[in-house]
Amino acid sequence: MSEQANYSGTDASGVGLIGRADDSVLPIGMHDFTEAAHRCVLVDKTMFIADVLDCDASIVVCCRPEGFGKSMNLSMLRAFLERPAVGRADRSLFAGTQIWDAGGGRYRGEYACYPVVSLDFSGAVGSGAAVAGVVRDALSSECVRLLPFLEAPDLPRDKVRHIERVARGAANEDEVDSVLAVLIELLEMACDEQVVLLVDGYDAAWLSRAGIRGTRDDGPTELLDRVLFDAIVAAGDSMRLACLMGECPGPAE
């Protein structure tokens, strides 16, 4: 990604910094942008958000080696775009950053605007037969986290119950594997806004190089096709964008 051709910050060096307190530390081993911005000094990479928002494609696949800030960038993207379930977003997190001032502030209109589905499949790497469990646990966790958005009485009750069963761990494999498309549909209806999908380690199951044997006798690529990519296709205009982070192109090609 270009980071808007290395947008020039306020420093003479052209490098913008976030969190310049004298006692700030480097975010070594940290992946949560909000926590890091409050506790550490960060190089301002917020124009990555502009790169994603300005991309002509609605699906952005970012491939970077391990240790190159994939999880931090996704966390930053989520912190900027995610609409809170209750209350108002705190604008101070991005005040003074490059993205906040770029283009005369034109990106501020998308701040805290969208419901965000955030999936982390990175734990599936090397997990062998447990790949399916890692993927399905990630889906279940997001159903739990996003349930507060689905309290509107006019939502289709059968679909809300589908989400609730997955959140409680009472759903069968078919229901879990198909839940992402339902979740995106309901979030768009509940919030009257398109949905953002963020996936960390989308290629993890493929990278594991280990076939899995479940009730469907599927391999990891087929699992991702069914759980992730079929849902992206089904979502259509319900999604503002999808950003997938991984180490290799693999199944996203």
Task: Name each model feature, range by range.
Residues 58-76:
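Walker A/P-loop nucleotide-binding motif
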Residues 29, 34, 44, 50, ...:
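P-loop NTPase motor core
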Residues 143, 179-190, 217-240:
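Substrate-engagement module of ASCE P-loop NTPases
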Residues 124, 191-217:
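Conserved P-loop NTPase "ATPase switch" module shared by AAA+ and STAND
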Residues 2-36:
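Charged, amphipathic alpha-helical linker segments immediately N-terminal to NTP-binding catalytic cores
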Residues 146-198, 231:
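Mid-core helix/loop region of P-loop NTP-binding domains shared across ATPases and GTPases
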Residues 196-200, 226-227, 240-247:
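Structural recognition of the conserved hydrophobic beta-strand(s) that form the central parallel beta-sheet
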